[in-house]
Amino acid sequence: KKHAVIGGLYMVIRGTETGVNLERFVLGALLDDVTRKADVRLSVMSGGRYQLQRARGERVDARKTGGLDLEVMDSYTGKSRVASTLSGGETFLASLSLALGLADVVQEYAGGVHLDSMFIDEGFGSLDQETLDLAMKTLIAMQGQNRMIGIISHVSELEERITTRLRIEKTQRGSIAAFEIDG
């Protein structure tokens, strides 16, 4: 009887019947937490249009992906679609939301560890004006939560919105770095 119990536990841990082993199950639970946090920001940045969710149903082959694929619920169409169908700007917003959600979850799970700094490299050039406004409002709100957000970008419109900048300029003799602070 003891061997049967141990054998049964082993099969559950390996995911023999469900196709999802214990590791993927735990990762899925963590991804759900990250997705919930990311949704708050993605909803703001997309004007309420998008929500992230784990893919379900026939689109998922749990043995290959472990049920860790994401879909996007589009409130305009009322349908879910695979994340790969998002435009470049929409993909940037979803990625930014996931990064921010991950930072939130790590902070919660780490018991007192604070992730006070984040650097974002590009992506803003793919956003239309309205979406850029929403993304910037989200990032500025994060500054009010004692977080430093560094944006690495060549988008000139951001220069007008960011009051403290570290400008890097290439010259023939090397790069020059200078802080600029608007009054």
Please give the residue ranges for each predicted region.
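Terminal ABC-like ATPase head and other globular end-domains that cap long coiled-coil arms
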Residues: 1-183
